[in-house]
Amino acid sequence: MLDANLADRKVVQYVMNRVGFHAKHRLGQNFLIRPDVVAAIAEAAELSDGTPVMEIWAGIGTLTQALAETGADLTAFELDQSLKRVLDHTLEHYKNIYIIYEDVLKADLKTILGERDWHCAANLPYYVTTPILLTLIQSGLPISLFVFMMQKEVADRILAARGAKDDGALTLAVQF
């Protein structure tokens, strides 16, 4: 699927139908179908040939494809094992992608990823955004750049001023 744009709704529907995959909304599986948003995330990740980048929850490979197109050295985590057949189909031509089918919240990130200076990109489901952010912060990994698409409510909590209504543990963890 080298020439297919995975951010196109028709391509997503075709791929999902072809491999018999149905999104699991209990896992927050809502796939990006806005090419402009996917391109903006990939551009903001500041990637070039060989840049180590970690993607959290690859989904059907929409953002994964855009990140891989930069030539970055991409390691993607995916929780849902049933997406393997989708990702094998959509990303088969890319040699710079390594996918780990494991829950990033339970993975030994330091052992898996080592001490390289990482960039991190993701389209995060609402229900797990805070646990993922806290896991990454507490992992001790050398991550120099985070680029996440998330719900506005979570972003508001992250950016809240001290003492504001949305101020909390997430605010403190991210800002300090």
How does the language model describe each region?
Residues 1-176:
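Catalytic cores of RNA-modifying enzymes
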